From Swiss-Prot:
The keyword Chloroplast applies. Disulfide bonds: none annotated. This is Uncharacterized protein ycf19. It comes from Porphyra purpurea (Red seaweed). The keyword Chloroplast applies. Belongs to the ycf19 family. One of its GO terms (biological process) is chloroplast fission. Pfam families: YGGT. It is found in: Plastid, Chloroplast.
Length: 95
């Protein structure tokens, strides 16, 4: 009995689901950044910052700011969405 396709399917599905949850967290952080009253040193905002900042720092500085706004999170979101599409397509083909 070959369990590799089932295991691979489960692994790729888990990575795709994790990427989707992470994308929602990034979008939540970017939406909250528009509100000046959010104190990023209090919970739950501090945890949200600690979870999303390492990933977003990878892309910071890769795109110059436009109109005073940092556009590098867009690159991170596009990369994460590409990963989700790839993992979902590979998962569907291996089923």
């Amino acid at each position: 009995m070959n369990t590799l396709p089932g295991t691979l399917n489960l692994l790729l599905g888990s990575i795709a689901n994790f990427s989707e949850i992470y994308l929602i967290l990034i979008l939540l952080k970017l939406s909250l950044a528009w509100f000046p009253t959010v104190n990023w040193y209090n919970e739950p905002f501090c945890s949200l910052n600690r979870i999303t900042d390492p990933y977003l720092k990878l892309f910071r500085g890769s795109i110059p700011p436009m109109f005073g706004m940092d556009m590098s999170p867009m690159l991170g979101i596009i990369f994460l969405q590409c990963l989700m599409v790839i993992f979902n397509n590979v998962r569907l083909e291996s089923a």
